[in-house]
Amino acid sequence: MKEKIIKAVVLGDVTIGKTSLLVTKKIGFPLEYIPTIFDNHYFEIKINDQIMRIGCWDTGGGEEYPRPLSYPQTNLFLILFSISSRNSFNNCETYWLPEVTKFLPSVPIILVGTKTDLRNCDDYKDKSTFVTYEEGLEMKDKINASAYLECSSLLNKGVDDLFDTMAIIGNNDLKSIIPNQLLRDHYNQSQRSEIYEAQRNNYENNNNNNNNNNKCIIC
């Protein structure tokens, strides 16, 4: 069986479950908060006797992360939001879609609602602001996404379905996508090294000053 490789970039606001989703798929749900500094996760998915290797680029959701560095040769974008965060949902259309279409307008998008377990969580008394499945479908049409899926990393529900969908959609777009001039000019190689090193040093300093051992994330 011939192996195909799909590059997927995972986008979304901070603390909405991007890293937890990928870690859950790989080893199970993480009990501690994992801050993101560019990380890659690889998965093998078998669809119709064909093995596809999906490389997921986990990006930070803050302004300080030079995300476009990870965009060249991308076959698929995942735009995530938390169903408990109306702001992260709205940002899919107002922030993340413009960024994606600015650099790689022809790459397919999968819209993903995370933390669906919170719909049945007693800790949330007022769920009137939660994003419904129907609203997710409407947003899919607004941003012209190829699919809308929901998942819970905590319950490991919908995660496998998401990756199967990624393999199917990504497989249909394995042609090499040449980044436009905006992307080529965004950062040169020296800037990449300086920015990445500054980010890592900043994270290590913050990690030494802040004890996050008791901080958990529900996904």
UniProtKB/Swiss-Prot annotation:
Membrane topology qualifier: Lipid-anchor
SUPFAM superfamilies, A to Z: P-loop containing nucleoside triphosphate hydrolases
Residues the record lists as binding GTP: 12-19, 58-62, 114-117
Keywords: Cell membrane, GTP-binding, Lipoprotein, Membrane, Methylation, Nucleotide-binding, Prenylation
Entry's transmembrane regions: none
Entries under InterPro entries matching the protein: P-loop_NTPase, Small_GTP-bd, Small_GTPase, Small_GTPase_Rho
Gene Ontology MF, one: GTP binding
SMART domains (UniProt xref): RAB (SM00175), RAS (SM00173), RHO (SM00174)
Pfam families: Ras (PF00071)
Propeptide: 217-219
Cellular component aspect of the GO annotation: cell projection; cytoplasmic vesicle; cytoskeleton; plasma membrane
Residue numbers carrying Cysteine methyl ester: 216
Cysteine pairs bridged by disulfides in the record: none
Motif mapping: Effector region: 33-41
Location(s) in or outside the cell: Cell membrane
GO biological processes: actin filament organization; cortical cytoskeleton organization; establishment or maintenance of cell polarity; mitotic cytokinesis; regulation of actin cytoskeleton organization; regulation of cell shape; signal transduction; small GTPase-mediated signal transduction
Sites of S-geranylgeranyl cysteine lipidation: 216
Principal location class: membrane
Similarity-based family: Belongs to the small GTPase superfamily. Rho family.
PANTHER family membership: RHO FAMILY GTPASE
Protein name, entry field: Rho-related protein racN
Biological source species: Dictyostelium discoideum
